[in-house]
Amino acid sequence: MLIKVKTLTGKEIEIDIEPTDKVERIKERVEEKEGIPPQQQRLIYSGKQMNDEKTAADYKILGGSVLHLVLALRGGGGLGQ
């Protein structure tokens, strides 16, 4: 199914996903199209930040749904530090 990912600049990226795809996979598809590493991406759907381990179906994402992409700020004592 085709979904859209909207960036902060207003650009819309169209991505073909399966309902069983994890959010992590959606981020990989965004990286393929935009070159933004998954660890720097935060995907928002229905006002909630999406968990990498959940699937599109867990969030009830349907064809034509629009996700919002925001970039994670560096620093702040994240997991990798």
Swiss-Prot record:
Disulfide pairings: none
Pfam families found in the cross-reference section: ubiquitin
SMART domains: UBQ (SM00213)
Protein location: Nucleus
Residue numbers bearing the N6-acetyllysine modification: K48
Sites marked Interaction with UBE1C: L8, I44
One of the GO BP terms on file: modification-dependent protein catabolic process
Propeptide residue interval(s): 77-81
Keywords: Acetylation, Isopeptide bond, Nucleus, Ubl conjugation pathway
Sequence segments annotated as region (Interaction with UBE1C): 70-72
Cross-link (Glycyl lysine isopeptide (Gly-Lys) (interchain with K-? in acceptor proteins)): G76
PTM characteristics: Cleavage of precursor form by UCHL3 or SENP8 is necessary for function.
Superkingdom assignment: Eukaryota
A GO cellular-component term linked to this record: nucleus
GO molecular function, one term: protein tag activity
Tissue localization of expression: Expressed in the CA1 region of the hippocampus (at protein level).
Main location: nucleus
Family classification: Belongs to the ubiquitin family.
Stated role: Ubiquitin-like protein which plays an important role in cell cycle control and embryogenesis via its conjugation to a limited number of cellular proteins, such as cullins or p53/TP53. Attachment of NEDD8 to cullins is critical for the recruitment of E2 to the cullin-RING-based E3 ubiquitin-protein ligase complex, thus facilitating polyubiquitination and proteasomal degradation of cyclins and other regulatory proteins. Attachment of NEDD8 to p53/TP53 inhibits p53/TP53 transcriptional activity.
Assembly and binders: Interacts with AHR; interaction is direct. Interacts with NUB1; interaction is direct. Interacts with ESR1.
PANTHER family reported in the protein's UniProt record: UBIQUITIN (PTHR10666)
The protein's name: Ubiquitin-like protein NEDD8
